[in-house]
Every structure is written in C-alpha cells, then in structure tokens.
From Swiss-Prot:
Function: Negative regulator of class I heat shock genes (grpE-dnaK-dnaJ and groELS operons). Prevents heat-shock induction of these operons.
SUPFAM superfamilies recorded: GAF domain-like, Winged helix' DNA-binding domain
Protein name as annotated: Heat-inducible transcription repressor HrcA
One Gene Ontology biological process: negative regulation of DNA-templated transcription
Organism: Streptococcus sanguinis (strain SK36)
Endpoints of the signal sequence: none
Gene: hrcA
C-alpha cells in the first residue's frame, strides 16, 4: 500500500529523474517534501521494497523502476494538460497550405518527433471503416491500366495492373461497372468480404471468360486493405533500443496492428510501459492518442520511446499537437466539401 506521502515522493523522484537521468537522494527531496530526511529515506526504502524504486550502481540515490513508472502512469499521470509554452510553435508549424491528408499527418509526426526526441507514427482512419465513394479505371497503354479508388470522398488510392491477355476493352468497362454497382458506398471491410464470397458467384454474369478475374480483383483491391502508416524519427530508436526494434518498423502493417491493439474501441488515449507482446518492443513505452478526422472518424498519433520518459510533458505535447491537428483537418475537409469556385 503506497501512502499519500510515498506517492508524492515517487512522483517527485520520477520528475527529477526524467529531467536529469541521475539517481535521486533524500536531500534532493527535502525542499519539496515537508518531512525530515530520515522520514523521506524510510519512505524511499518502503517504495524500494514494493519494487517501485531501485538502487543505482554508481550512487546511493534511487531511481524509478519499470513498475514505478507503471504505477505513476496509472495513478498520477494527467491526460488533460496542455503544453501551453509550445502552443505557438505547434500552431506555426501548421500555418501553411497542405495539398493532401498525408502531408498534414507527416507534419504532425515530424513535429512531435522534434518536440519529444522519440519515434512517432500517425495513422489515418482504420481502412476497414472507410467507404468506397468513387472508382475508375484509366488505360495507360495497350497492356497496362490504373485503378483509381476514392475512399471517404477524399482519400485517393491507385493500383496499376497489367491488363489480362484475355481481356477486351469491354471487359474493363464491365469490371468498372461491377465495382460501381456492387461496392460503391460499402465499407472496405464489406468489400473484402464480398470479393471472397459474392463476386465468385456472379462474375459469369458479367464476363464471357472468367479466367483471372478473381485474381485481378484481389490484386487491384489489395492496397485499399492496407494501413497508411506515416513514420517519423525512426532513427531515434537506435538511441534507446536495439536493431530489432528498428527493423520492426520496416513492416508498416505490423506497426499499425501494434498501435491499434494498444487502444480499446472506446479509449482515446493509452500509455503502455514495457507492456508489448512484441519482444523487440517489450522494454519500450508506447503512448497512443486518437484525434478526430472530421466527417470520417479517428486517426491515431503514437509515440515510441524509452521507459524513462517525461510522461507528463510528452502527453501534454501530444494534446497540443492533437488539438491543432484537428483544427487543421477541420479546415482541410471543410474546403474539400465546399464549392471550389464559390466567392469567399
């Protein structure tokens, strides 16, 4: 059982240690804790016995253990604070015109990496929740074509493919018509299901020769099922982790799954301290925070860093970036949904 004073001591030690990265002795706490040095030492010993503090090899002071950081996150971390001193820098970073969503998310990730010194990932709305709102096929040459998907009326994905040898121009038109008839307005998750269940049953109604049609569907639709992962500060991993963690971030889909898995459906923020099922991330911290993408749903900003982070400062920085990012996205999508030629 951690007493109120012991909790205060633990919080203060974490605050000092995350700023100095030096073990903390009882004398360093006396100005802030209204107790004698002996009492503080006894409380520090009690915290050590509970596994929340640990001895340092080079000093008589103590430092927070992994369990100590986990306790702090669970009992003392405030998720509502804003890093107001960095608000101007964040607003200034977004104070120019962006031409697509990916650039806005990249700016947010780059900015948070700069502020935190950590690796940052930004995710769009989960692919399975997005809806197909437009589809077209553009013939590039005699043998190649480009499938153009628009999701949520704003997110464009393209997939280049070789036109099957047995296809005529009319077959491409039939393919386009089939997609528009069966898939427009459907979620990506529903489309994924229909390609495997409904389409094999009906393609003979549309195509004289059905060879390669299912394979072509799976090929051109493959990219819309994938997460769009925006990454910044990957090299930072090498400062607080090893090569296996660095290489883990070479697989964007695994990275996205790890981040999605850290947040429950109804959870807006999550801090996981040394709590990943991925062995290469087991000694790291993952902080995830959802942000609103107007008209579409929620994206996610995630920070990966060492256990000995200044959690309060970093969460406050993420809150500021999230708020300004949402403001920028609101303006961006309001423009997309307006009449381009209307007089302002």
């Amino acid at each position: 059982m951690v007493t109120e004073r012991q909790n205060e001591i633990l919080n203060l030690i974490i605050d000092i240690f995350t700023k100095t990265h030096e073990p903390v002795g009882s004398k360093a706490l006396q100005d802030s804790i209204n107790s004698s040095s002996a009492t503080i030492r006894n409380d520090m010993a009690a915290l050590e016995k509970q596994g929340l503090l640990e001895k340092a090899h080079t000093s008589s002071g103590r430092k927070p253990s992994v369990a100590g950081f986990q306790y702090f996150v669970k009992h003392s971390l405030s998720f509502d604070r804003l890093a107001e001193n960095e608000l101007y820098e964040v607003i200034k970073a977004f104070d120019h015109e962006f031409f697509n969503l990916e650039d806005i998310l990249q700016q947010a990730a780059d900015l948070l990496t700069k502020l935190s010194g950590c690796t940052v990932v930004a995710l769009d709305v989960e692919p399975s929740r997005q809806r197909l709102t437009a589809f077209d096929i553009v013939v590039l040459s005699q043998h190649t074509a480009l499938a153009v998907f628009t999701l949520d009326e704003s997110n464009t994905i393209t997939s280049q493919f070789m036109i099957p040898r047995n296809f005529l121009k009319e077959d491409l038109d039939r393919l386009k018509g089939l997609v528009r008839e069966r898939f427009l307005g459907q979620t990506v998750l529903d489309i994924h299901y229909k390609i495997r269940t409904e389409i094999p049953q009906i393609i003979q109604r549309y195509f004289t020769t059905t060879d390669n049609v299912i394979q072509l569907f799976e090929h051109i639709f493959g990219d819309i099922f994938k997460e769009n992962v925006i990454l910044s500060g990957k090299v930072q991993l090498l400062e607080f982790s090893d090569l296996t963690a660095y290489q883990f971030f070479d697989d964007p889909q695994k990275v996205a799954f790890e981040i999605r898995d850290s947040l429950a459906e109804d959870q807006m923020q999550s801090v996981r301290v040394a709590d990943s099922r991925e062995s290469c991330l087991a000694d790291l911290t993952l902080i995830s925070s959802k942000f609103l993408i107007p008209y579409r749903g929620f994206g996610v900003l995630a920070v990966v860093g060492p256990v000995n982070l200044d959690y309060q400062r970093l969460v406050s920085q993420m809150n500021v970036v999230n708020r300004v990012l949402t403001m920028k996205l609101t303006d961006f999508y309001r423009y997309l949904s307006s009449n381009h030629y209307e007089v302002h």
